[in-house]
Design a protein with these regions (language model features):
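Extracellular "spike/adhesin" assembly and maturation modules
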Residues: 1-36
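Intrinsically disordered, low-complexity regions enriched in Ser/Pro/Gly/Gln/His and often acidic
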Residues: 6, 21, 40, 48-51, ...
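Conserved beta-strand and immediately adjacent loop positions that scaffold enzyme active sites
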Residues: 20, 57, 150-152
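Glycine-rich, low-complexity segments
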Residues: 26-70, 160
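Extracellular attachment/recognition segments
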Residues: 66-160
Length: 160
């Protein structure tokens, strides 16, 4: 019996071992079962609502039909001035996905700002074509304050 590699458990032989083609085929099956990145790049999609523009989504498609996408949105024209007391909020914004999705199973949003605040995911439960968010702040904002919203989405695409 040949030795095996640590990560995939592939069979390896010394030069004086007898090669068993059944074990070679097992190696190919183990490799074929691995999920690999089949495509990556950048695609654009629009966002609109409280703020509008074009999002550059960086993505990785995988051989099992899953996808990971992320984007960074930068705003100089958003302020948290909605509500009668803290937390104050911005208008809602919808960011479209550049791919048709059959399932979205993970969405993460993060905010970078000069003020104390956070970004709130207000996307509906069964929405598969976009995410919706509001920026929240503890202080009422009279002026526009530069903010960045980072969004990461994981899911399953329609056409593999």
């Amino acid at each position: 019996m040949p030795n095996v590699t640590k990560k995939l458990g592939l069979n390896i032989w010394l030069e004086n071992d007898i090669v068993d083609f059944e074990q070679i085929n097992e190696n190919f099956q183990k490799i074929d079962d691995c999920v690999i990145c089949t495509e990556s790049g950048i695609k654009t999609a629009s966002y609109s609502g409280g703020v509008s523009g074009t999002a550059n989504w960086r993505y990785k498609k995988y051989s099992d039909g899953t996808i990971e996408m992320s984007t960074k949105l930068e705003f100089t024209n958003i302020k948290c001035n909605g509500g009668s007391k803290a937390p104050y909020y911005s208008g809602s914004s919808t960011v479209q996905f550049p791919f048709s999705m059959s399932e979205v199973y993970d969405v993460q949003m993060h905010l970078a700002s000069n003020t104390i605040g956070w970004v709130s995911d207000i996307t509906g439960k069964s929405v598969l074509d976009s995410v919706m968010f509001r920026v929240m702040a503890m202080e009422y904002e009279d002026d526009y304050i530069y903010k960045q919203v980072y969004i990461t989405v994981k899911g399953v695409i329609d056409n593999v």
